[in-house]
């Protein structure tokens, strides 16, 4: 038990260091990089600004946050297995399969809804950008945002809110940082 705890701690420290470096390389100030590395990896979702990640208006920062949220919401027992070189176990894990299936379905549905709603001027890439971030944040129960909450409730309406709500309810798995199930 002591050995396993130590390994998970080292993995977490390593992910944190890499996350800080990636946020910094994406253009985030160092202090903010440290803060968001911790909050995205732990899927805590705390933000330093009211606008959350949207404050930076930076697609690279959003991409880093997406990757870090997914890593943080992945079963940490699998991290060790993957780092030992056993990638097959990652793809065999039922929680991982379900999470990726929900993620892809959610992204597809929200992207189509946003594109068809003309809220983003029928801009497909912008619709994908916002849907991927919000869907990942909802499914991992992180709560970081690239779209203000009032904009989601007032403009996204219907299907977008429904999909995000379902994903938040389903949330992360038992061995994730979120410990929802």
Predicted regions span which residues?
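Membrane-proximal intracellular helices of multi-pass ion channels
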Residues: 1-181
């Amino acid at each position: 038990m002591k050995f396993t705890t130590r390994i998970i701690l080292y993995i977490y420290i390593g992910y944190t260091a890499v996350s800080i470096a990636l946020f910094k390389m994406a253009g985030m100030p160092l202090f903010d990089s440290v803060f968001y590395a911790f909050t995205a990896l732990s899927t805590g979702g705390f933000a330093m600004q009211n606008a959350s990640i949207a404050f930076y208006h930076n697609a690279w920062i959003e991409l880093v946050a997406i990757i870090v949220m997914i890593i943080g919401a992945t079963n940490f027992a699998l991290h060790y297995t993957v780092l030992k070189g056993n990638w097959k176990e990652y793809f065999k894990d039922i929680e991982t399969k379900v999470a990726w299936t929900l993620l892809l379905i959610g992204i597809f549905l929200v992207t189509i809804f946003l594109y068809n709603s003309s809220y983003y001027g029928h801009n497909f890439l912008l619709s994908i950008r916002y849907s991927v971030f919000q869907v990942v944040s909802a499914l991992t129960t992180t709560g970081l945002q690239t779209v203000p909450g009032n904009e989601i409730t007032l403009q996204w309406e219907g299907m977008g809110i429904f999909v995000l709500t379902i994903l938040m309810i389903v949330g992360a798995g038992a061995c994730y940082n979120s410990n929802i199930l």
